């Protein structure tokens, strides 16, 4: 089953006949595979690890699948070139110029850019967002509540440098000052949000192997290692830009941790002495409530004897019931009018 934006691309796939195609920021469907009906080859770069896992079982000599903030093994002077680059307009609008610059770096001269997105997702502002080295974006299709724009690479794009897309700032935490590196598209208030502040203000003393689930830009990781530098910390997220941000944050603070993608806890191994998180489930939708349930269930199985589990969550979400059902007991060490802190120690 193809998503609505992917269906719009299929409606317009004739322009890809025998093209070497790159798909950026694709969704959790098999659109890149479907394009092989007309394209000579397709490379797909997912920025969401779940989307990558959905597609990668179908990889073959004509379909290469990647996860990350950029294509791997590229010569910065001569990156690999494509006849067409397809960009799925990102939900985080500040990420769009990054994706357009990345696309331009991988297009042949006068190569085709296709940008698709849902009407409600900000794509209507595409013409203003396209850099000057692209021709003016032309609307090619309007269907399935989506828009498809086309353009061509007319000029020369600046070389991709990750440092051009990072904002670095100092953050005061209960553990002291830390430097945060935030890439475009990664959530940041440039101050300590209320939930994380509640978590860090009541940080337990941990030991051994600790997991930071949904690490984002690495705020919790850096604060944790500042206070408890002896920890063997692992940081996981599903978002490529978040993982790259976390690595930059740790480096800026002279800290080390294992940073890697994981869909839930599926890519973690073994048991942990501690699991800490401000989990990214804040919208109360059924889908995210199910992800939250899976996180609680899976993390309960991966706690060592005497292991500590502590998360902060919006108080209106049904965490109390989920945690009580899984752990059999529930401690709330602190709360405010918006957030609750949940704590459990494995016996």
From Swiss-Prot:
Provenance organism: Shewanella sp. (strain W3-18-1)
Entry keyword set: Cytoplasm, Methyltransferase, rRNA processing, S-adenosyl-L-methionine, Transferase
The keyword Acyltransferase belongs to this UniProt entry's keyword annotation: no
Protein name: Ribosomal RNA small subunit methyltransferase C
Catalytic reaction(s) noted: guanosine(1207) in 16S rRNA + S-adenosyl-L-methionine = N(2)-methylguanosine(1207) in 16S rRNA + S-adenosyl-L-homocysteine + H(+)
One Pfam family linked to the record: MTS
Recorded family membership: Belongs to the methyltransferase superfamily. RsmC family.
CDD domains xrefs: AdoMet_MTases
InterPro entries, per database record: DNA_methylase_N6_adenine_CS, Mtase_sm_N, rRNA_ssu_MeTfrase_C, RsmC/RlmG, SAM-dependent_MTases_sf, Small_mtfrase_dom
Superkingdom, natural source: Bacteria
EC annotation from Swiss-Prot or TrEMBL: 2.1.1.172
Oligomeric and partner information: Monomer.
MF terms in GO: 16S rRNA (guanine(1207)-N(2))-methyltransferase activity; nucleic acid binding
HAMAP family: 16SrRNA_methyltr_C (MF_01862)
Subcellular location: Cytoplasm
UniProt function note: Specifically methylates the guanine in position 1207 of 16S rRNA in the 30S particle.
Keyword Cytoplasm recorded: yes
Gene giving rise to this polypeptide: rsmC
One GO term describing the cellular component: cytoplasm
């Amino acid at each position: 089953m193809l998503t609505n934006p992917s269906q719009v691309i299929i409606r317009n796939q004739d322009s890809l006949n025998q093209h070497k195609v790159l798909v950026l920021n694709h969704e959790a469907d098999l659109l890149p595979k479907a394009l092989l009906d007309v394209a000579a080859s397709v490379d797909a770069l997912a920025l969401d690890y779940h989307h990558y896992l959905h597609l990668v079982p179908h990889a073959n000599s004509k379909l290469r699948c990647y996860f990350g903030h950029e294509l791997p093994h590229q010569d910065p002077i001569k990156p690999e070139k494509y006849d067409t680059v397809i960009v799925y307009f990102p939900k985080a609008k500040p990420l769009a110029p990054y994706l357009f610059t990345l696309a331009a770096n991988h297009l042949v001269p006068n190569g085709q850019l296709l940008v698709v997105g849902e009407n409600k997702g900000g794509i209507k502002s595409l013409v203003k967002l396209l850099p000057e080295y692209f021709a003016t974006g032309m609307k090619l299709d309007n269907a399935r509540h989506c828009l498809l724009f086309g353009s061509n690479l007319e000029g020369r794009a600046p070389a991709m440098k990750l440092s051009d897309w990072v904002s670095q700032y100092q953050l005061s935490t209960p553990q002291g000052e830390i430097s945060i590196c935030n890439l475009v598209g990664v959530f940041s208030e440039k101050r300590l949000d209320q939930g994380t502040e509640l978590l860090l203000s009541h940080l337990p003393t941990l030991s051994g192997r600790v997991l930071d689930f949904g690490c984002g830009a690495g705020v919790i990781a850096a604060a944790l290692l500042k206070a408890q530098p002896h920890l063997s910390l692992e940081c996981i997220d599903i978002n490529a830009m978040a993982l790259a941000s976390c690595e930059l944050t740790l480096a800026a603070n002279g800290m080390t941790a294992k940073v890697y993608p994981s869909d839930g806890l599926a890519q973690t191994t073994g048991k942990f002495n501690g699991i800490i998180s401000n989990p990214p489930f804040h919208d109360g939708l059924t889908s995210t409530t199910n992800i939250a349930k899976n996180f609680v269930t899976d993390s309960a199985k991966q706690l060592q004897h005497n292991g500590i589990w502590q998360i902060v969550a919006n108080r209106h979400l049904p965490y109390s019931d989920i945690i009580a059902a899984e752990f059999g007991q529930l401690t709330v060490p602190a709360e405010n009018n918006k957030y609750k802190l949940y704590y459990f120690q494995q016996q």
